[in-house]
UniProtKB/Swiss-Prot annotation:
Gene name tied to this protein: aspS
Organism: Pseudomonas putida (strain ATCC 47054 / DSM 6125 / CFBP 8728 / NCIMB 11950 / KT2440)
Intracellular or extracellular location(s): Cytoplasm
The keyword Ion transport appears for this protein: no
One CC-aspect GO term: cytoplasm
Lineage of origin: Bacteria, Pseudomonadati, Pseudomonadota, Gammaproteobacteria, Pseudomonadales
Subunit structure: Homodimer.
Function: Aspartyl-tRNA synthetase with relaxed tRNA specificity since it is able to aspartylate not only its cognate tRNA(Asp) but also tRNA(Asn). Reaction proceeds in two steps: L-aspartate is first activated by ATP to form Asp-AMP and then transferred to the acceptor end of tRNA(Asp/Asn).
Name listed for the protein in its UniProt record: Aspartate--tRNA(Asp/Asn) ligase
HAMAP family with a match to the protein in the record: Asp_tRNA_synth_type1
Keywords: Aminoacyl-tRNA synthetase, ATP-binding, Cytoplasm, Ligase, Nucleotide-binding, Protein biosynthesis
GO BP term, pick one: aspartyl-tRNA aminoacylation
Membrane-traversing stretches: none
Region (Aspartate): 198-201
Aminoacyl-tRNA synthetase in keyword set: yes
Positions bound to L-aspartate: E174, R220, H450, R490
Length: 591
């Protein structure tokens, strides 16, 4: 081997021993005739000292520059008093170098690694192989590896089998657009890259494998946000003969053990909350419980007021009128309120009403707001009592369609929690349960809230009679307002699966065409089964404190779903297109 140790492995126990290191020159310093090189490798850094007594080695050290790849042999020695570097794992020792081989030279990097500052993300992604040399980036990928190792170990110990499922499959309606792959041997036909291994893992349960897992690549051609990538990694789990409480208990144990092993954090039992309660209190099905602010419904106090902005939604069963109290917010300037008004507009809110509570003892005179003159004093007091308002608070209001108010004030709740530093703890895991089976569209049609294979908490007949009120056997694990994973008990009877398809507007012919293999499988003794899938990238993002999942993926795509390093996607030549039976249509230019 070319090295005896990694830099991060060196410590005082090796004092006096000869070591050989291989790595990159992170920093070079010349201090009065003595040259110091900070050598960096995957595991950390070490300081190497070269003195002029060894003329040939000293001259070689004098020639090296940042990012040269070197092999160094020397003797470990303790650093002098006052020279210990507490910020470096090997900071108590240094190596007296007496042999240096330059394995490769390096041009000046496009951005400095040792004084990293405001480098644009596109530049970082263009030179990702340089960006990943930075210790903080390498630390994230090392932690990612520890996370996957911990998860694999837990699942292996609990009897799960790691089974790979196909990457080339057929398109099925799962919500997002598929990435399509043209077939050369079947002209005019296309494979689809999987959005998840959902159907294959269910078929593995039908086949009797009982406990399956896979750390799987998944693909979705969708609009990208901070927590989305066109290709992402999923921790995919499926079991037979367990109900939802048992699956939730098992996967919760996995996450608790993971945080203990990797971050030395102890979690207690995760609280459970229904979807209805989460939406009512927090305006979100993935509430951040670290923030002690809640939405409070006040429609009953505003049904008869002479103020249509409130009275209209208060009397509409599809709408919601909600208050959100911010303690100590009465001193907020109008410019800040305008900023928050613009913010909730992103979610469809037409405005943001408010009341500043200056001095409740003075009645209406002690309240500052353009809306108080439209609401009877008794109703105002009832509202302020209900939200717990005291002098110095501000109360915001939302009145609109249920979804608009929930999303707008739910997002405002999060924004206020961070802007005013209200977080009560660092970590807040939880479960959300009892999701609706379907989301009703404006035209009266239905969309599956999770996916079409989720089992309901009722019979097929009850489901078809009352689809809008049916609850599913679905469950989501949420951490700090981020959905870590979602799962459900699956449909294992053909009649129920056909009923769900019908409610989604998928008639018998289309069912057979797109899902015939699944319906066939359900005829041949499918066991009760269910599972859960975690987003690995999101999990690593949370555990490393990264701001985006792009920070925890080795080679991510940009927000426009492109790789600036490899220039993918790229054009292909005409011959390759002909073999795939594809002809590109010329785009007409708009004058």
């Amino acid at each position: 081997m070319m090295r005896s140790h990694y830099c991060g492995q060196l410590n005082e126990s090796l004092d006096g021993q000869e070591v050989t290191l291989c790595g990159w020159v992170h920093r070079r310093r010349d201090h009065g005739g003595v040259i110091f090189l900070d050598i960096r490798d995957r595991e950390g850094m070490a300081q190497v000292v070269f003195d002029p007594d060894r003329a040939e080695t000293f001259a070689a050290a004098d020639r090296v520059r940042s990012e040269y790849v070197v092999q160094i042999t020397g003797k470990v020695r303790k650093r002098p008093e006052g020279a210990v570097n507490a910020n470096m794992a090997s900071g108590a020792i240094e190596i007296l170098g007496y042999q240096l081989n330059v394995l490769n030279e390096a041009e000046t990097p496009p951005f400095p690694l040792n004084e990293y500052s405001d480098v644009g993300e596109e530049t970082r992604l263009r030179y990702r192989f340089i960006d990943l040399r930075r210790p903080e980036m390498a630390d994230k990928l090392r932690l990612r590896s520890r996370i996957t190792s911990s998860i694999r170990r837990f699942l292996d110990e609990n009897g799960f089998l790691d089974v790979e499922t196909p990457i080339l499959t057929r398109a099925t309606p799962e919500g997002a657009r598929d990435y399509l792959v043209p077939s050369r041997t079947h002209a005019g036909s296309f494979f689809a890259l999987p959005q998840s291994p959902q159907l294959f893992k269910q078929l593995l349960m039908v086949a009797g494998f009982d406990r399956y897992y896979q750390i799987a690549k998944c693909f979705r051609d969708e609009d990208l946000r901070a927590d989305r990538q066109p290709e992402f990694t999923q921790i995919d789990i499926e079991t037979s003969f367990l109900d939802e409480s048992e699956i939730m208990g098992l996967t919760e144990s996995m996450i608790r053990k993971l945080f203990k092993e990797v971050l030395d954090l102890e979690f207690g039992e995760f609280p459970h909350m229904t979807f209805e309660e989460a939406m009512r209190r927090y305006g979100s099905d993935k509430p951040d419980l670290r923030i002690p602010l809640e939405l409070v419904d006040v429609a009953d106090q505003l049904k008869d007021v002479d103020f249509k902005v409130f009275a209209g939604p208060a009397n509409d069963p599809k709408c919601r009128v909600t208050a959100l109290r911010l303690p100590g917010g009465a001193s907020m300037p109008r410019s800040k309120i305008d900023e928050y008004t613009k913010f909730v507009g992103i979610y469809g809110a037409k405005g943001l009403a408010y009341i500043k509570v200056n001095e409740r003892a003075k009645g209406v005179e002690g309240l500052q707001s353009p809306i108080v003159k439209n609401i009877p004093e008794a109703n105002l007091n009832n509202i302020l009592d209900r939200v717990g308002a005291v002098d110095g608070d501000i109360v915001f209001f939302g009145a609109d369609k249920f979804k608009v108010v929930s999303e707008a004030l739910g997002a405002l709740r999060i924004r206020l929690g961070h802007d005013f530093e209200l977080l009560t703890c660092e970590w807040a895991p939880m479960w959300v349960v009892d999701f609706p089976m379907f989301e009703e569209n404006e035209d009266g049609s239905f969309t599956a809230l999770h996916h079409p294979f989720t089992a309901p908490k009722c019979t097929p007949e009850e489901l078809e009679a009352n689809p809008a009120t049916a609850l599913s056997r679905a469950y989501d694990m949420v951490l700090n307002g981020t959905e870590l994973g979602g799962g459900s008990i699956r449909i294992h009877r053909k009649e129920m699966q056909q009923a769900v398809f019908r409610l989604l507007g998928i008639e018998a012919e289309e069912q057979e065409e797109k899902f015939g293999f699944l319906l066939d499988a359900l005829k041949f003794g499918a066991p009760p089964h269910g599972g859960l899938a975690f987003g690995l990238d999101r999990l690593v993002m949370l555990m490393t404190g990264a701001q985006s999942i792009r920070e925890v993926i080795a080679f991510p795509k940009t927000q426009s779903a492109a790789c600036v390093m490899t220039q993918a996607p790229g054009m292909v030549d005409a011959k390759a297109l002909r073999e795939l039976h594809i002809r590109l249509r010329e785009q007409t230019k708009v004058e």
